[in-house]
Amino acid sequence: MAAGGNGAGGDTRAAFARIYKTLKEELLTDPAFEFTEESRQWIDRMVDYNVLGGKCNRGLSVVDSYKLLKGADALGEEETFLACTLGWCIEWLQAFFLVLDDIMDDSHTRRGQPCWFRVPQVGLIAANDGIILRNHISRILRRHFKGKPYYADLLDLFNEVEFKTASGQLLDLITTHEGEKDLTKYNITVHGRIVQYKTAYYSFYLPVACALLLSGENLDNYGDVENILVEMGTYFQVQDDYLDCYGDPEFIGKIGTDIEDYKCSWLVVQALERADESQKRILFENYGKKDPACVAKVKNLYKELDLEAVFQEYENESYKKLIADIEAQPSIAVQKVLKSFLHKIYKRQK
Amino acid sequence: MATAEVVVANGSGGADTKTAFKEIYSKLKQEMLEDPAFEFTDESLQWIDRMLDYNVLGGKCNRGLSVVDSYKILKGVDVLSKEETFLACTLGWCIEWLQAYFLVLDDIMDNSQTRRGQPCWFRVPQVGLIAVNDGIILRNHISRILQRHFKGKPYYVDIIDLFNEVEFKTASGQMLDLITTHEGEKDLTKYNLTVHRRIVQYKTAYYSFYLPVACALLLAGENLENFVDVKNILVEMGTYFQVQDDYLDCFGDPEFIGKIGTDIEDYKCSWLVVQALERAAENQKSILFENYGKSDPACVAKVKDLYKELKLEEVFHEYERESYNKLIADIEAQPSKAVQTVLKSFLHKIYKRDK
């Protein structure tokens, strides 16, 4: 029963939620800034609105990975706190990216509510709020990890992953801009690069890297693990692209608009590779338009090219390659971490 | 002659420091464009190249150059070695990069039109709100530069913590400015000296005044926790600097200050309007309530006439003299002569400036 108290699945979530409250309270009383009542209320609301509301899979996976690396079912109180805190830093990082992405994409809703910049009184103040969210990570890390031998490594890790993600976002923005003029600019290399940098590093590599640092490891010795996780993250994003078009809106929680938004989606890239001239013309004439008739023509073409079957084959091959790469890793604990990630996403429907 | 050549080659005098500073920008930019942490496409390289030149260059670089000047004074030398020059200039550029990041985002949030005589970056065709991500890239470049050139130095973590803390204070000050302006648009009496001071302290003073000297102190091997008095003096100086800015926005010569001030139109929590609110009689307050924050030139003129009526130019000059006297007294109470020299150097660059 003691084991249960310290971190079985349900209890991990409860601890995770409690630690959010601790961290937020610390940020709202940060001695580095003299808060006014208005500014404290603003940040309180802003943080709840943007950091909460997701599934917290990235954050929780730091705790899960750390347990697997330690070969323990239960973590000590301090260990739980540190792992959850790093997990929340990743959730804060994602919140920062999403707030700014929504502004740049001119989006309307996020997780079933208006995007933060759409909220009355907020508008483009949201850009500074995104910056505040990013700065909260540095404040949290300094408060709880300064003095740890891996503190500088944590700072470098978060900074490097942020740099890769922002660079991937830049690539996405200017590629879409270029693609709107010439759809043939969309290809598998460009798509691979965008998803690798924009999503895979912070969603897959970062949680495991945090767990490795907590375990006292040197990340320079884990280049293979980084590569596997980036590959897994790429596969995850291809699934996202597929589900945007083929997923059940009831399940995925939104109506996909990649076609309307002129996205460099894996589906359109595959279509361009397989289409003959007349089919390509259908893409050139209908991709990136809001008109439901145009969207339907693109979807019909995807069916004609049998892209669902292409995706199934891609998924099967990706899974096999990932499993082979994982099982080539010398550490059994690391293998377990990587398989745990893979099995959470394999053949998911949302 | 060898000595003279070394002196010239290594950066004596203002002009040579500026030359070295400029050369180091080119080197740092090249490193950013070749960063192994990202696979650049030609399009993304061209974009970042242009974005950097547009936003990081173009200012006077006073903040950046003051790292070098301060470091020389702290070391008590006229000449720095090549390595010392490089490290000091690099930290100076990190501050310029930091300011560029803030200004790109501030211009978006303020819906501004021009910056340093050219359209704001987000106004440039093809850019628009991609500028938000460009701001983030600018911030990330600082971390990349620091990791590349300072990792392995005993003060590496201290530099990162310093930049992170100053960034946090600046973003928090910006937030305070944004929500205060929002509140003030509904109720001008929300503007007061305490709020104004807090905004300018956090939004400007830490990164413009404290950060350059703190960088020089770290380069000199100092522990910043032993220099809290220095921090307080520099924050006070930065506050005075911003009050000057507020004054010059309204009373400065546009030819000199390089822009036409719009604090009145923009409903800014300016030191001038705060002083006016403190001194105005009820009917004068009504003039402020009815005319402040409007673009109509007639309304602006009424506010300016009221500022004259309340003799705010004289109030400012008295404030300036008192600030100077207090700052000099605080500086001369510092135990280190080198630190005194650094602080006086900063103060004399800004005292009674007219742009």
Swiss-Prot record, chain A:
Binds 2 Mg(2+) ions per subunit. GO terms for molecular function: (2E,6E)-farnesyl diphosphate synthase activity; dimethylallyltranstransferase activity; metal ion binding. It is an enzyme of class 2 (transferase). Mg(2+) 1 binds at residues 101, 105. GO terms for cellular component: cytoplasm. Keywords: Cholesterol biosynthesis, Cholesterol metabolism, Cytoplasm, Isoprene biosynthesis, Lipid biosynthesis, Lipid metabolism, Magnesium, Metal-binding, Steroid biosynthesis, Steroid metabolism, Sterol biosynthesis, Sterol metabolism, Transferase. Isopentenyl diphosphate binds at residues 55, 58, 94, 111. Pathway: Isoprenoid biosynthesis; farnesyl diphosphate biosynthesis; farnesyl diphosphate from geranyl diphosphate and isopentenyl diphosphate: step 1/1; Isoprenoid biosynthesis; geranyl diphosphate biosynthesis; geranyl diphosphate from dimethylallyl diphosphate and isopentenyl diphosphate: step 1/1. GO terms for biological process: cholesterol biosynthetic process; farnesyl diphosphate biosynthetic process; geranyl diphosphate biosynthetic process. CDD domains: Trans_IPPS_HT (cd00685). It comes from the Eukaryota. InterPro entries: FPS1-like (IPR039702), Isoprenoid_synthase_dom_sf (IPR008949), Polyprenyl_synt (IPR000092), Polyprenyl_synt_CS (IPR033749). The keyword Transport does not apply. It catalyses: isopentenyl diphosphate + dimethylallyl diphosphate = (2E)-geranyl diphosphate + diphosphate; isopentenyl diphosphate + (2E)-geranyl diphosphate = (2E,6E)-farnesyl diphosphate + diphosphate. Its EC number is 2.5.1.10, 2.5.1.1. It is found in: Cytoplasm. Belongs to the FPP/GGPP synthase family. Catalyzes the sequential condensation of isopentenyl pyrophosphate with the allylic pyrophosphates, dimethylallyl pyrophosphate, and then with the resultant geranylpyrophosphate to the ultimate product farnesyl pyrophosphate. This is Farnesyl pyrophosphate synthase. It comes from Zea mays (Maize). The lineage of its organism: Eukaryota, Viridiplantae, Streptophyta, Embryophyta, Tracheophyta.
